[in-house]
Amino acid sequence: MIKLLLRQLIKFKVIFIIAVLFFAIPSSFGDKGTFVDEIKFIQYLDENTALQEVRNGNLDLYYFRVSSDRLEDYNSRENLQVFESTGSYYSILTNPTDSGKFNPFSIKEIRFALNYLVDRNLIVNELLGGFGSPMISNYGVFSADYLGILDVTESFQFRYNTSLADQMISDELEKAGAKKINGIWNFDNEPIEITIFIRSDDPVRKSIGEILSFQLESIGFIVKKDFGDLNKAYVVVYGSDPAEQKWNLYTEAWSSTGFSRYDSIALAQMYAPWFSNMPGNNTPSYWNYQNEILDNVTQNIYSGNFETADERTLLIKDATKEGVNESVRIFLASKVDQYVVNENITGIINALGAGVPSRFTPINASSNDGSLVIGVKQIYQGAWNPIAGLGDIYSNQIWGILSDPGMYGHPFTGKIIPLRTTWNIETNGSHSSIPVHDDAIIWNTKTQSWNTVESDLTAISKITFDLNFSQWHNGQNMDINDILYSIYFLTEWGSEKDVNDKTYDSHFSPQAVQNVNSLVGFRIIDDDTIEVYTNYWHFDDGQIASWAGTWSTTPWEIMSAMEKSVIDGKVSFSRSDAVSKNINWLSLIVPRDAKIIHDILEDFKQSEYVPSSLNQFETSNAYYENRYNQSINWIEEYDHAVISNGPFYLERYSPESRTIVTKSFDYGDYPFPPGKWHEYEQIKFPKITSVEIDEVISKNSSVKIPILTKNSSEIHYFLSNSRGQIISEGKVSVNENNSIINLDSETVSKFDTGANTLKVFAASNDVLRPYEYSTSFLASETDTSLPNVEITTTLSESGQTDYSFLVIVIALIIGAGIIFIIKTRSKRTQKTTI
């Protein structure tokens, strides 16, 4: 379920708060940040139909992968631009509950046995057409931390082996008291039935589900197949109590919406109960999967409780080992996605991770008629709210152009870059002691007021943010009150849960509390400058800024109305809370929920309501009335409550026609001109143009291997024997496109007599995507030639390639960093469900 990694985590990135109300845009015009005036998103479930529509020009581009067999030759690509990108992958989620009827997957060893029952190579080679790589853990071949955990993942030695899986499962079932009668496993004289929820809207996952069903039936289970899309999965799988056993297995997929060097979320999101993404989702009334080891280790990674990159890597190894051993979520394969764009469209930005659907593409793209028509796989699959909604890839791809985060991950390096905030950081390492200003304040959840911090406080890091405000889509100016409310909300809803606590959400709060625990205080310097003091440190300054980032993508009055609607029990922020309480999952794009927000705003206006988080700073009744009026007017005109600050605004959502229309925001002083992201269009990727190595080398000699490259800063090389063991590896610099690998005679003598392999990667400091060259050579004990043997050479930038070494290179390039999805907030990012 591609949980994109897009739902912005709350790493004290107040940025996560999404706006949902819009007021009628004033008739005056201002600065425009886009080339096109309108974008229409239209649902196309069938990829083949969408492909033909893009080819014919009825669609300008399609925001979902197209099967490789539809783009095999020149004729199939007529009138098309084809872009390849990595970032999506597949997994199996198991239900490990031990409550209710007998559940075989409550037994860890049976879950683990599934790793031998799934044929990862078949998934890659047949279902994905070779465009992918097998996965053992949540770190795929393009994750920078892959190298650091390579010894852990390789130690599992998973190979497709149905006999072994059958034996492992049978042994555990017999221990539990089950018996096999006439080829069917029974428990307490009842056949053991397994329900697999299969995503029927995705051909790959449908095939995975069908194959797995057949294999489990062959072992002796009764298998019930339940088909559906993400909307149904939100209810049956993610929203239900695992103890009800409405499902036992689910075919998931995940996608990225951005790119980041360092990932603090992935392991927690995919393995740890505290993050509210494992069976039970931390819903108090549900059965919940528990694992203190995973919770403790991933919380240390998440909150920066390490001093060095090596220490961080050890934590990642520990969590990975425990996560794979537990096998509640089993990873299968990563995918190389192919996106199609009509040949007449310019300005496409094929970002690493997010691919063509990155937020930069619609903002930067141009067409002949000043509009874009974009096909999407699904137009609506989950609630639109910034707290515990927007967790699917489909909503996030659109939300990304409606909102501007304070900072963002560079689409090709992953480096945190300023967008609407700039910063200055003061810290002296993980044991730093920065004095906290006496005027700094912190929210007191008991007195419901801002209090000055205690005297003589210190913090590990101090970050001063300069905020680049503009207008909300409803015409009102952004201001410091929006920031104040965001900090209040994070603190109030991220406080430890009390009895009958109404400001607690089972999904949002456990994540928020990690940030709140590190927040020491903050100080307003002026109307657009704020100081933040935090007990958080990272060896990368951008990560410190991301953790402490103060920004808002939703007006405070919308946030306040949402908060009241949840406290009053009308709706819920999260899916699981909504299901458990039998209320609606708050979605600002839906007229029904927008009406709830509208009516609360009317009550606020009539009662002259002033939030307790703002009454110490803003006393003008006219200010509050104007804020309420603007958002009320917006909802009345547009029938939704999605209000933000990005270059496009949401004009309408039409569920009947399965369309969403956005228009360029031309009012006010939007800070970025059209073409701001032009530099990302034609990124120069590294390339190897030649490698000179003899087909036969003597093991008694030294060897020089000249290499010619383009757009490269360094060369990484790996030499391995016929058994795949790495004999030598290293890195050499590039000087004027030239580089030489020097191997001394001692190194050469270690080669196997016979076939060996050289893999070379050209890397660039500007793009974290190396170019791969691979060739075989023969090693001889003497200087005499060996019999003729076919020598294979491969040059590859992407596509049907063995990416195992590519991952290693990326990891070396960025050290202990992580390539990960950066949700449209510049903050920590999560995978989003597909």
Predicted segments, located by residue:
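Local pocket/hinge segments that shape ligand/substrate recognition
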Residues: 32-33, 43, 65-170, 186-188, ...
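Append "and occasionally in soluble cytosolic enzymes with long acidic Gly/Pro-rich linkers
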Residues: 106-218, 318, 360, 364, ...
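Aromatic- and charge-enriched surface segment that lines or borders ligand/interaction sites
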Residues: 50-58, 101-113, 117, 434-499
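Periplasmic binding protein-like
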Residues: 51-66, 75, 218-276, 475
